[in-house]
């Protein structure tokens, strides 16, 4: 069991394994008792609870996997089926940054082609800089290949839904259906050799499955029912999102992010004339931003990207010294600051806000249970990795489940589920820890910390191999 501990064991990966503890920690939906099976129960090889982007993609990937051609898969979604008959001229304010690794997953079951035929915007550079100094880091590709894509969540869901319909003979989708109870047939420690998980739906019907996959968000009922501890905290911040019109048309292929003392602000390209805003700030300031008149809101955005009000002469002088030292040590060209586009107006009714926090499940798997996406981890949007982490979970879990199916193994066995957990916890805990550290490091204008992060950012920007490693890690 020790091998399953992630790198932040003391903080994010606490484990509890005794049967007594597991029984004591049963969540509000769990009933750890023997279940008398009914012949009327529907039986599935895999049930995915939660039909958002990650849950739907999980079910779709299983349905398109060659080794699952003879399996029965069920996707449970509490909401109604969403249809997108045609694209609105107005862009949605909820978008995702899709990494190259995520495009590989979406391409594997045909969804990426639908997305490309609808709309998405590639970005080829990413500039991140500090509002308290001249320090910056520029991520780009030597050959100016695409680094990633900004896609509306509705477009992603439509593409996945189309591909789910293509495997309707293998994947059944129950919309407006929510699990209200889960029952494991005995102590978790014995479940590898026991009957299956039993699920009760809101209409009173019941079903059984060899493997239950929880993709039901950061308030996951599956995680609570399994008694899996979740470590997390709120950031006392909200993210303000909006769709913005630029002052003039540009190639608009750069993703911009500036760290303010109140939180990061990001501008993500949607088209040559439109960008999406994600501004993380205090709850009070977020509410103020959402209620501002349009002119005030636009002025606040432009000021956040352009103003040097947080600069000090001392920090600027120290930053200049390091810049000159780097230039002497590395005579080759170091990425220089580019100027972000200015904003002219905001789409009507596109402003919204949502609270921010961090969360991480101590375990991703139990016998016959696996967690993916926000059910397993919740991250600050400054990393732009929320849905990419979920898609990375899918890629890993599909690998282990496909191998198990090919070898005729029990899909709910810990013998392969632990491989998925180890793989993803190593990646996700590192990303969560780095994101949380950056959030805290940049949430201050204290001079010693400003100097520390300024020198760190300048040094990182000068070391191309290190930047390439960061980009490669983020794309997994």
UniProtKB/Swiss-Prot annotation:
Q: What EC class is this?
A: oxidoreductase
**Reaction(s) catalysed by this chain's protein:** 4-hydroxy-3-(all-trans-decaprenyl)benzoate + 2 reduced [2Fe-2S]-[ferredoxin] + O2 + 2 H(+) = 3,4-dihydroxy-5-(all-trans-decaprenyl)benzoate + 2 oxidized [2Fe-2S]-[ferredoxin] + H2O; 2-methoxy-6-(all-trans-decaprenyl)phenol + 2 reduced [2Fe-2S]-[ferredoxin] + O2 + 2 H(+) = 2-methoxy-6-(all-trans-decaprenyl)benzene-1,4-diol + 2 oxidized [2Fe-2S]-[ferredoxin] + H2O
Q: How does it sit in the membrane?
A: Peripheral membrane protein
Report the InterPro entries cross-referenced here. FAD-bd, FAD/NAD-bd_sf, Ubi_Hdrlase_CS, UbiH/COQ6, UbiH/COQ6_monooxygenase, UbQ_mOase_COQ6
The GO terms this record gives for MF are: 2-methoxy-6-polyprenolphenol 4-hydroxylase activity; 4-hydroxy-3-all-trans-polyprenylbenzoate oxygenase activity; FAD binding; oxidoreductase activity; oxidoreductase activity, acting on paired donors, with incorporation or reduction of molecular oxygen, NAD(P)H as one donor, and incorporation of one atom of oxygen; oxidoreductase activity, acting on paired donors, with incorporation or reduction of molecular oxygen, reduced flavin or flavoprotein as one donor, and incorporation of one atom of oxygen
Tissue expression: In the kidney, expressed almost exclusively in glomerular podocytes. In the inner ear, expressed in the spiral ganglion, as well as in stria vascularis and spiral ligament cells.
EC number(s) per entry: 1.14.15.45, 1.14.15.46
The record's subcellular location field reads: Mitochondrion inner membrane; Golgi apparatus; Cell projection
Please give the SUPFAM superfamilies that the UniProt record associates with this protein. Answer: FAD/NAD(P)-binding domain (SSF51905)
The UniProt entry, under Pfam families, shows: FAD_binding_3 (PF01494)
GO-annotated cellular components: cell projection; extrinsic component of mitochondrial inner membrane; Golgi apparatus; mitochondrial inner membrane; mitochondrion; ubiquinone biosynthesis complex
Q: What superkingdom heads the lineage?
A: Eukaryota
Q: Hey, which pathway is this one from?
A: Cofactor biosynthesis; ubiquinone biosynthesis
Q: Which Gene Ontology terms describe the biological processes this protein takes part in?
A: ubiquinone biosynthetic process
Q: Which UniProt keywords apply?
A: Cell projection, FAD, Flavoprotein, Golgi apparatus, Membrane, Mitochondrion, Mitochondrion inner membrane, Monooxygenase, Oxidoreductase, Transit peptide, Ubiquinone biosynthesis
Where's the transit peptide in this chain?
Answer: 1-42
Q: List, separated by semicolons, the cofactors it needs.
A: FAD
Transit peptide among the record's keywords?
Answer: yes
- What does the record note on quaternary structure? Component of a multi-subunit COQ enzyme complex, composed of at least COQ3, COQ4, COQ5, COQ6, COQ7 and COQ9. Interacts with COQ8B and COQ7.
Name the job this protein performs: FAD-dependent monooxygenase required for two non-consecutive steps during ubiquinone biosynthesis. Required for the C5-ring hydroxylation during ubiquinone biosynthesis by catalyzing the hydroxylation of 4-hydroxy-3-(all-trans-decaprenyl)benzoic acid to 3,4-dihydroxy-5-(all-trans-decaprenyl)benzoic acid. Also acts downstream of COQ4, for the C1-hydroxylation during ubiquinone biosynthesis by catalyzing the hydroxylation of 2-methoxy-6-(all-trans-decaprenyl)phenol to 2-methoxy-6-(all-trans-decaprenyl)benzene-1,4-diol.
Q: Which PANTHER family match?
A: UBIQUINONE BIOSYNTHESIS MONOOXYGENASE COQ6, MITOCHONDRIAL
Record-stated family: Belongs to the UbiH/COQ6 family.
What name does UniProt use for this protein? Ubiquinone biosynthesis monooxygenase COQ6, mitochondrial
């Amino acid at each position: 069991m020790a091998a399953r501990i992630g790198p932040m064991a003391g903080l994010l990966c606490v484990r509890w394994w005794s049967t007594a503890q597991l029984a004591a920690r049963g969540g509000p939906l769990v009933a750890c008792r023997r279940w008398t099976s009914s012949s009327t129960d529907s039986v599935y090889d895999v049930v995915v609870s939660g039909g958002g982007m990650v849950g739907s993609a999980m079910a779709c990937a299983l349905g398109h996997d060659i080794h699952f051609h003879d399996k029965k898969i069920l996707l449970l979604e509490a909401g109604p089926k969403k249809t997108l008959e045609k694209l609105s001229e107005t862009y949605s304010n909820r978008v995702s940054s899709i990494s190259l690794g995520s495009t590989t997953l979406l391409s594997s079951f045909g969804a990426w082609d639908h997305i490309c035929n609808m709309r998405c915007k590639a970005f080829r550079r990413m500039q991140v800089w500090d509002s308290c100094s001249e320090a910056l880091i520029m991520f780009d590709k030597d050959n100016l290949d695409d680094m990633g894509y900004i896609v509306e969540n509705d477009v992603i869901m439509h593409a996945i839904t189309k591909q789910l319909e293509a495997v309707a003979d293998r994947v059944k989708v129950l919309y407006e259906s929510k699990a209200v109870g889960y029952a494991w047939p005995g102590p978790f420690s014995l479940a590898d050799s026991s009957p299956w998980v039993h699920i009760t739906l809101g209409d009173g019907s019941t079903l059984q499955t060899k493997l239950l996959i929880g993709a039901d968000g950061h308030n996951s009922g599956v995680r609570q029912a399994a008694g899996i501890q979740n470590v997390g905290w709120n950031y006392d911040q909200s993210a303000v999102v909006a769709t913005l019109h630029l002052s003039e048309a540009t190639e608009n292929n750069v993703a911009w992010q500036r760290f303010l003392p109140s939180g990061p602000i990001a501008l993500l390209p949607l088209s040559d004339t439109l960008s999406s805003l994600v501004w993380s700030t205090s709850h009070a300031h977020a509410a103020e931003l959402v209620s501002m008149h349009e002119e005030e809101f636009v002025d606040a955005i432009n000021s956040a990207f352009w103003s040097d009000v947080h600069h000090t002469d001392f920090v600027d002088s120290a930053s200049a010294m390091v810049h000159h030292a780097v230039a002497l040590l590395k005579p080759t060209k170091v990425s220089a600051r580019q100027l972000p586009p200015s904003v002219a107006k905001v789409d009507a009714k596109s402003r919204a806000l949502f609270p921010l926090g961090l969360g991480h499940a101590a375990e991703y798997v139990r016998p016959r249970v696996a967690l993916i996406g926000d059910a397993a981890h919740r991250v600050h949007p400054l990393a732009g990795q929320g849905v990419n982490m979920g898609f990375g979970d899918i890629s890993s879990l599909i690998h282990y489940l496909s191998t198990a199916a090919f070898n005729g193994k029990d899909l709910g066995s810990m013998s392969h589920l632990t491989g998925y957990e180890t793989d993803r916890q190593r990646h996700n805990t590192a990303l969560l820890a780095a994101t949380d550290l950056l959030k805290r490091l940049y949430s201050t204008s204290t001079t010693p910390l400003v100097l520390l992060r300024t020198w760190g950012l300048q040094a990182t920007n000068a070391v191309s191999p290190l930047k390439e490693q960061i980009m490669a890690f983020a794309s997994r």
